[in-house]
Amino acid sequence: MWIGVISLFPEMFRAITDYGVTGRAVKNGLLSIECWNPRDFTYDRHRTVDDRPYGGGPGMLMMVQPLREAIHAAKTAAGEGAKVIYLSPQGRKLNQQGVCELATNEKLILICGRYEGIDERVIQTEIDEEWSIGDYVLSGGEIPAMTMIDSVSRFIPGVLGHQASAEEDSFADGLLDCPHYTRPEVLDGMEVPPVLLSGNHAEINRWRMKQSLGRTWLRRPELLENLALTDEQRILLTEFQREHLTEATN
């Protein structure tokens, strides 16, 4: 997968290219990330990249000319078929379904805004989609872009040691993940659930699904509203709810 990034702070993306899962993906040639800095497309000695908005008001906007030239340079490098995304609070909120959709693209260009944003006409003429990572304000689009790169790259074949890791993540099937345990078997008096030590994989999978359904019901019940649960899942959820109620009243 190839990802182009337009950012005034390309150095920030070393966190993605040099470390962790994404760093290994880059090293192994599974993921390629290239950055363009709009400052490199300025023609004044101050390398100006911001300008005042028409109509007044606080703050500045990213200057059109260097931003557009950076976008065009990225598009040229990408060739045909690259989807251009602007990370914006006004965009579609990123969730696991959206990540899966984005992961089907071979090429993405991510535009990281700064200041008060970018000229609306640039959005209309250069941007294919706007995406947001949540209803809160950040100083720029770099962290949202890194979030998107990290989540999307997990679906590139070969990036994870076990592809099942991506398939079993929280939200992969619309549910939160189940609890996980490792050694020691007893920690401060708290024991690992016996079923996980049983070696019975059918029972382990059943327990994990029940915990996943129950955790979603407790923490993110709205997620269940959009899911078509199987008969088995309904039974497991009812079991969890009954057990939870019993524990709460004891």
Curated annotation (Swiss-Prot):
<comment type="similarity">
    <text>Belongs to the RNA methyltransferase TrmD family.</text>
</comment>
<dbReference type="Pfam" id="PF01746">
    <property type="entry name" value="tRNA_m1G_MT"/>
</dbReference>
<keyword id="KW-0819">tRNA processing</keyword>
<dbReference type="GO" id="GO:0002939">
    <property type="term" value="P:tRNA N1-guanine methylation"/>
</dbReference>
<keyword id="KW-0808">Transferase</keyword>
<keyword id="KW-0949">S-adenosyl-L-methionine</keyword>
<keyword id="KW-0963">Cytoplasm</keyword>
<comment type="subunit">
    <text>Homodimer.</text>
</comment>
<protein>
    <recommendedName>
        <fullName>tRNA (guanine-N(1)-)-methyltransferase</fullName>
        <ecNumber>2.1.1.228</ecNumber>
    </recommendedName>
</protein>
<dbReference type="GO" id="GO:0005829">
    <property type="term" value="C:cytosol"/>
</dbReference>
<dbReference type="InterPro" id="IPR029026">
    <property type="entry name" value="tRNA_m1G_MTases_N"/>
</dbReference>
<dbReference type="InterPro" id="IPR016009">
    <property type="entry name" value="tRNA_MeTrfase_TRMD/TRM10"/>
</dbReference>
<feature type="binding site">
    <location>
        <position position="113"/>
    </location>
    <ligand>
        <name>S-adenosyl-L-methionine</name>
    </ligand>
</feature>
<dbReference type="GO" id="GO:0052906">
    <property type="term" value="F:tRNA (guanine(37)-N1)-methyltransferase activity"/>
</dbReference>
<keyword id="KW-0489">Methyltransferase</keyword>
<dbReference type="InterPro" id="IPR029028">
    <property type="entry name" value="Alpha/beta_knot_MTases"/>
</dbReference>
<dbReference type="InterPro" id="IPR002649">
    <property type="entry name" value="tRNA_m1G_MeTrfase_TrmD"/>
</dbReference>
<dbReference type="InterPro" id="IPR023148">
    <property type="entry name" value="tRNA_m1G_MeTrfase_C_sf"/>
</dbReference>
<feature type="binding site">
    <location>
        <begin position="133"/>
        <end position="138"/>
    </location>
    <ligand>
        <name>S-adenosyl-L-methionine</name>
    </ligand>
</feature>
<comment type="function">
    <text>Specifically methylates guanosine-37 in various tRNAs.</text>
</comment>
